[in-house]
Amino acid sequence: MHEMSLAEGVLQLVEDTARRESASRVKLVVLEIGRLSSVEPEAIKFCFEAVTHGSIAQGAALEIIAVPGAGWCMQCAETVPMTELYGACPTCGSHQVQPTGGTEMRVKEIEIE
């Protein structure tokens, strides 16, 4: 489960930000997770709750925004929606599709007090 190490990385970033801003606690963390990122939202929620126990982020709400997948089809020469990382182009069926979006995970927002 790689979500545990991802949650630990998010916590480190959140703690660093809270420390830099002299915050007393973290109220909310908003993550953007791409549909093609191989990150399971429910698993990251579970892991986030586990790793934040006893930290400045304990009890913080975790909001996840799903980012749709997109890719460049070399056959169609256009951007197409993608639901699978190595899926076929929904327009022409070609597998020559280069992902251009939805593969990332990033911290979009941190709300602190």
Swiss-Prot record:
PROSITE patterns: HYPA. Keywords: Metal-binding, Nickel, Zinc. Zn(2+) binds at C73, C76, C89, C92. One of its GO terms (biological process) is protein modification process. InterPro entries: Hydgase_Ni_incorp_HypA/HybF_CS, HypA/HybF. This is Hydrogenase maturation factor HypA. NCBIfam families: hypA. Ni(2+) binds at H2. The keyword Zinc applies. Belongs to the HypA/HybF family. GO terms for molecular function: nickel cation binding; zinc ion binding. The keyword Lipid metabolism does not apply. The lineage of its organism: Bacteria, Pseudomonadati, Pseudomonadota, Betaproteobacteria, Rhodocyclales. Involved in the maturation of [NiFe] hydrogenases. Required for nickel insertion into the metal center of the hydrogenase.
